[in-house]
Regions:
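Non-catalytic pre-domain segments flanking phosphatase-related domains
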Residues: 2-115
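C-terminal cap/substrate-recognition subdomain and adjoining C-terminal extension
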Residues: 9, 32-40, 187-318
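Structured segments of extracytoplasmic/periplasmic soluble domains
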Residues: 97, 101-105, 124, 128, ...
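Asp-based phosphoryl-transfer active-site loop
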Residues: 109-124, 178
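Short, solvent-exposed loop/turn and secondary-structure capping segments
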Residues: 124-128, 132-135, 189-190, 301-304
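A solvent-exposed, charged loop/short amphipathic helix patch at secondary-structure junctions
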Residues: 129-153
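Short, acidic loop-to-helix structural element flanking the phosphoryl-transfer center
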Residues: 147-177, 184-185, 190
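Structural beta-sheet core signal
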Residues: 178-180, 291
Length: 318
């Protein structure tokens, strides 16, 4: 979700057990109602109602099974994702639920799945460690695979359980579509990370170097997305990246999708953009049996038989 200016990301800050329970209950109620969860606007009355930010970071590191040493810029980001962590277990559980659902619906005609990229099919935890939860589009692009406009290798690992789930879906005859808020300029690099460098028509790299640290370059090994007619940006594969303002495709120019944003000359909000793309996919004759995302904005506004929320405590994108 990175090619265009990105909404501010924020680390979850605990604010006392009672408030946390209220917030979680409210979020669950909102999710059930199919509405966008509101931004947290509670103003603590005292320090005792907050969790220390460093403690919150430690909670996140424990959840992901990361080293406990303070990371900071470039610290322990190059440690491989812990496949035995609570995060990995929870991600695999959602992937298994998805696999079971897709298997049960395998007789559906013209069936498809739609998947977000960041923290749905690729895990960006190493960037959170690298940046100390301070998103910067330039450094983030290096993890995506770009230094300027030059492809320098991908650094994001696959989300635990998801490559197997998507591969199973492909074997069952599902069309595979990826839908991300990353910009068109990151399209090829994203294909390289999801599938392979050669699948994206890019040099087949084996390492990537960021801030002086060299790590193995990652090709996650997902199936190639299903081809569609020419989309925005001239791409014909089934990875939908977000076009620049002023270059949205005609199918998004509807009042319920990006029409108001197109008229105003501003970026289309995630919910309207992603639901508009899903509507387009279904207009091509597909039945989206499952829609997978780590943000509520990946999942809301319909055009999918069932949605699956991947775990991600690191940031919130409306």
């Amino acid at each position: 979700m990175n090619g265009l200016p990105r909404p501010r990301r924020s680390l979850w800050l605990g604010i006392g057990l009672g408030v946390v329970l209220v917030v979680l209950a409210a979020a669950a109620a909102v999710a059930i109602a199919g509405l966008q969860p509101a931004d947290l606007t509670y103003t603590p009355n005292s320090e005792s109602q907050m969790t220390n930010i460093d403690v919150s970071r430690a909670y996140a590191k424990n959840y992901y099974g990361a080293p406990t040493a303070t990371s900071g810029a470039g610290g322990t980001w190059n440690t491989p994702l812990n496949q035995d962590s609570n995060y990995a277990s929870e991600a695999r559980s959602v992937a298994k639920q998805g696999d079971n659902w897709l298997s049960a619906r395998s007789k559906v005609a013209d069936k498809a799945i739609v998947l977000d990229v960041d923290d749905t099919t690729l895990t960006t935890w190493n960037y959170e460690l690298y940046s100390n939860w301070d998103f910067n589009p330039t450094t983030n692009a290096q993890f995506v695979g770009l230094t300027g406009s030059t492809f320098t290798g991908n650094a994001f690992p696959a989300t635990p359980g998801m490559v197997d789930m998507v591969s199973d879906a492909k074997a069952m005859g599902y069309a595979i579509f990826f839908l991300t808020g990353r910009g068109d300029s990151q399209h090829q690099a994203t294909i390289a990370n999801l599938v392979s460098d050669t699948a994206a028509g890019l040099p087949d790299l084996t390492t990537v170097t960021i801030s002086g640290k060299t790590v193995p370059e990652i090709d996650a090994g997902y199936p190639m997305p299903t081809p569609l007619d020419i989309q925005h940006g001239g791409f014909t594969d089934g990875l939908f990246t977000k076009p620049p303002v002023g270059q949205y495709p005609a199918y998004l120019n509807k009042p319920q999708f990006c029409g108001p944003s197109i008229t105003a000359g501003v970026s289309c909000p995630t919910i309207q953009y992603k639901s508009g793309v899903r509507a387009y996919v279904e207009s091509q004759g597909y039945d989206i049996v499952g829609n997978f995302g780590d943000q509520f904005s990946d999942l809301l506004n319909g055009f999918a038989d069932k949605t699956f929320k991947m775990p991600n405590p690191n940031y919130y994108l409306p």
